[in-house]
Amino acid sequence: MHTCRATKKSPSGSANVSRKIGFEERKAEDLLKNSISIPYPDGKIFTPTALSNDGIAYGEAVDQGHEDQNYLASMNLHTKEFQKIKDVEKTSNLTHVAVSYVDHDIVVFEEYDQLNQTGIYYLWKIKDKSLTTLIDRRPIGTVPVTQVARSNQKLFINYEVGDSLYQIEEFDLETGSHQTIESKNSGFPNVFKNYLYYVQIDNTALTTKIVAYSLSDGQKKVIDQTKDDQRYYVDLMTNGHNLLYLVANNKDASFTFENKNHKKIFSTSQAETSIYRNIYLTYMGERRSEERVKSQYYLWDLKHRIHYLYDHGPILLSDKGILWIQFKKKDSEIPKGEIYRNENSVMRYQEW
């Protein structure tokens, strides 16, 4: 699915990109100064990868001294309550858990085994603590790339069915029924108003189409498409009020964020794992300094056109808040794989 990519530039420093596109630059502390500090649970190594609107972080965890057994866990950022949800079934030492979607009532996650190439998707219902298997797929790619969108009691899961072919499956949470609604190679499903929007990807012709699938009658309509290998859609995202496109431009190796009417918001040399919630956009991009070792994260206020200069760890957004990882030392001094330890960083949480 992801072979449609612009060639990324090497790090050259992009701190001034916002000045060229009409965004005011501010220190990230101006926005995040009221964030509360939340240490990691004692005796646990917890890696938060998803944030719900009710202030609960979800991710993979292990108990220190028992790193061979990982599990899905949650942490209430208001009460600091830490909860184990499910142990990972260790079919090999390369079995991990990836959180695909969280809401106030459900969690969708995958346990994947890179060695045996198996992956199982689960639905966790929070209120009654019930677990349902949604998908059992074999074989899988080495790293799962799964996106989930929701409309009321229907889930739309985009996942690999084999040979780099990604399809979209609809699951009914009330009846348990499911059906394939897009069998062609596709990605980036987003529910916006009364439609499911997604990108149809032809990796042979190197073209992309944006498809609108009606949630009321199931009709599909192509609303936009690229016609050559110089420009193509590589992501869609919504905050519930606006729909954004991420466009790759091979001519100048750039990525452009546009709105649904193709009004350009800004361009950058690299943008991955984008999250758009409320008025904020974050993504992983080009390192702003040659001294930076770990991934560089960006934070933008699209409503007030502010680029917050941010130099700490991963960022998670919800409609109501932000969870960010504050480094306690230079990123180059934190050993690989040891960010989420109390001696190296602290979780910071703030609601809007």
For every predicted segment, state its role.
Residues G43-N53, S92-D103, I140-N152, S183-N194, ...:
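Repeated scaffold domains used in trafficking and secretory/extracellular systems
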Residues N93-Y101, D105-Q147:
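Non-cytosolic head/periplasmic domains of membrane-anchored proteins
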Residues G13-P41, Q64-D87, L115-R137, V161-E182, ...:
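Surface-exposed loop/turn elements that mediate protein-protein interactions on large endomembrane-trafficking
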Residues N16, T49-G65, S100-Q114, Q153-E160, ...:
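Short beta-strand elements that form the blades of beta-propeller/WD-repeat-like
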